[in-house]
Amino acid sequence: MSKLPIVIAPDERLTTRASEVIDITDKIKELVNDMFETMYYAEGLGLAAVQVGVLKRIFIMDVQPEKAEDGPAGYESTGKFCMINPEITELSGEQVILKEGCLSIPEQSHEIKRPKYLTVKYKNLNNEEQTLKASGWLARCIQHELDHLNGILYVRHLSKLKYDMAMKKAQKVKRHYEQ
């Protein structure tokens, strides 16, 4: 396993829709292991393949019990997952505003409104179809990472003015990281 470099915004890879994974090969499994190592090193909750420069529909996340929230019966709010070719099949009408951050937009966090509950279909590393009902931070993390796979940065959910300010700050931070 090895730590991968994280793509920092602005970068066109972060605004490009990722392509579906056709075969779950040993190379894909190695990528996922490296992504977990990278995410833990960076102290993130989730990481999409596009954030390490791989334009494939894969993301990982590990939402620990301290982030748990009470949700409806049958909904998970914590857990460690690898989701391949994920697709949200249901979103709750109930929305909640919480502060989010992103490993690709360091040194920033913003309040984002998202649905509180969801259902997602995906494949795991064993190429098995899975369905998950998620709530709380787990649901939020799924939406955030799936946005990455669709070429959408979380700051796109802000007003134009706040988005422009966030990207201006991101440009300054990126220059600092590149030195």
From Swiss-Prot:
Its cofactor is Fe(2+). Disulfide bonds: none annotated. GO terms for molecular function: metal ion binding; peptide deformylase activity. The active site is at E145. InterPro entries: Peptide_deformylase, Peptide_deformylase_sf. Binds 1 Fe(2+) ion. Its EC number is 3.5.1.88. It catalyses: N-terminal N-formyl-L-methionyl-[peptide] + H2O = N-terminal L-methionyl-[peptide] + formate. Keywords: Hydrolase, Iron, Metal-binding, Protein biosynthesis. GO terms for biological process: translation. SUPFAM superfamilies: Peptide deformylase. Fe cation binds at C102, H144, H148. The keyword Ubl conjugation does not apply. Belongs to the polypeptide deformylase family. Removes the formyl group from the N-terminal Met of newly synthesized proteins. Requires at least a dipeptide for an efficient rate of reaction. N-terminal L-methionine is a prerequisite for activity but the enzyme has broad specificity at other positions. NCBIfam families: pept_deformyl (TIGR00079), PRK00150.1-3 (NF001159). This is Peptide deformylase.
